Amino acid sequence: MTKMFQVKTLQALAACTIINESIPIFPSSIPSTMFEELQTLYSLFCLRKHEKVLDEKVDRLKVERQKAIEKSDDYHMDSSVLFAINDYVAGFDAENLGDYWEHCASIITSHIEKLEEEKQEISQEEALYLCKLGNTYNKI
């Protein structure tokens, strides 16, 4: 009966913490057997929150990349539009606006790839926390 109570209490505390981070939970009021589980749940919650922010950034960058690609296509078709960018601007010389927008799209793509890598690392860390929680609940 005590173990079942601990699981239910842990689930309730975790739910409250995840729904509203401002709810104060005092370590002295939490049984020591549950404190580590709460820390793990909160870490998992933080990872998921960060992952959501990364998803939003990736989505915005994909939209910007698409705009850059469209501008590149538009300007490549109009060969009369030419300009030069100084060497110190992004370290890139362009013969026309199409090349410039292609360059912008490639930079955005590299940022998206970096964010995707970070999301993969977060997913792996989440899996570890979930395994840790699974092992804890199996013990209880």
Predicted regions and their residues:
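Cullin-RING E3 adaptor/co-adaptor recruitment helices
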Residues: 1-78, 93-137
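Amphipathic alpha-helical repeat scaffolds of TPR domains
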Residues: 79-86, 91
